[in-house]
Amino acid sequence: MSLLKMEYNLYAELKKMTCGQPISLFNEDGDFVEVEPGSSFKFLIPKGFYSSPSVKTSLVFETLTTTDNKITSINPINAPKLYPLQRKVVSEVVSNMRKMIELKRPLYITLHLACGFGKTITTCYLMATHGRKTIICVPNKMLIHQWKTLVEAVGLEHKISIDGVSSLLKELKTQSPDVLIVVSRHLTNDAFCKYINKHYDLFILDESHTYNLMNNTAVTRFLAYYPPMMCYFLTATPRPANRIYCNSIINIAKLSDLKKTIYVVDSFFDPYSTDNIRHMIKRLDGPSNKYHIYTEKLLSVDEPRNQLILDTLVEEFKSGTINRILVITKLREHMVMFYKRLLDLFGPEVVFIGDAQNRRTPDMVKSIKELNRFIFVSTLFYSGTGLDIPSLDSLFICSAVINNMQIEQLLGRVCRETELLDRTVYVFPSTSIKEIKYMIGNFVQRIISLSVDKLGFKQESYRKHQESDPTSTCTTSSREERVLNRIFNSQNR
């Protein structure tokens, strides 16, 4: 650990790295506080900050030659086969680590790789290459299975722990597996942190963007007080401030043959209202809507909009245009509503729910991977990041208030490389609740802009798509009726 005075140059470097955001670190008293320039306190500067050679320091860090925590079960024959771009990442990592060892720098690297790149298999290859006992830390148990499958394929001795850390510590007294896969809440236990700091050399933080290391979290405390010898952050959407804890980044662009389309499903609704809606509208401008909780609650009870989403999904699914669908909502009650309605239409053999409150959901996710046709309804919290269903070909985004990082992660669920190349996203900028009309339009436009400008989607109007599709159930007369309704509504505003 390095306790340093917050001199101007150090503060400026940290500020630059976080894009001007406030910086919070542990001070010499162990308090997690916002750093102010010229502070009289000394601060605990994270080890990973010095992994970049651009950071000048006289500090010397230990290298792997001082430890003996080696994997005993490696079989080179079992090393996973990588694509050329994945091999390029491995080559970059090995080259960077040689330089780090030569310069006595911490072996900390962020793998900033696109959704669908294959971060998990690439990291498993690196793990086997290093031959060091490894901790794989995931934000939730849904991600456990994909790691388990690949670690087993590599043939490494491993153990999974998702529940009580106390019982795990008892087991570790008699056995110390080469690879330990845990959920991040285990890091709240100091005894466990001390154990892995002593007995494991490599720490892999999967989906590192899900942790805000400017908050006093278990992961923040672990990296500050029990820094591992080697560390990988894995993410497609890195948080700028997290660079303070892992300051060397490898990012390799991935060209894709996928045909990605985002359909804007617009419509013109008559104003819709209920007592419940009128009650929630009163809260839109209050402090209780600071994070747009009531905005999303209003969307969840916007019956005309919900019906439009269902009609669009049913039409596309029945036509065979899309086959493996992910439906995403912000709120659980919104998810349950869509699930029940779709279940009535298509039955339990086709419609599934990704409910965080159901312990069997991870097993259900595994079971649907091999299905040719299914509809999976879930929440942004549960399935917006890390959902491992590579065969997904379409996404219905039913919510609107989503930040850029969540948007990119969510769209990444349908950007996995498979033999089928068509990927389709549907967004719904219209609402029948006039008080949130412009707000919803602006939020959905942000989704559209990011998908087109950054992720290579092509924007198309769903109405034009229907008109050009001879199999569409939307008749010319119904389209004309909508146009007339639009004109009538505009004249009577």
Curated annotation (Swiss-Prot):
MF terms in GO: ATP binding; DNA binding; helicase activity; hydrolase activity
Membrane-crossing segments per the record: none
GO cellular component: virion component
Residue ranges occupied by any Helicase C-terminal domain in the UniProt entry: 309-456
Domain Helicase ATP-binding: 100-256
Pfam families attached to this UniProt entry: ResIII
Annotated coiled-coil segments of the chain: none
Record's subcellular location: Virion
PROSITE patterns referenced in this protein's UniProt entry, alphabetically: HELICASE_ATP_BIND_1, HELICASE_CTER
PANTHER family (UniProt xref): ATP-DEPENDENT HELICASE IRC3-RELATED (PTHR47396:SF1), TYPE I RESTRICTION ENZYME ECOKI R PROTEIN (PTHR47396)
Protein name, per record: Transcript termination protein A18
Taxonomy of the source species: Viruses, Varidnaviria, Bamfordvirae, Nucleocytoviricota, Pokkesviricetes
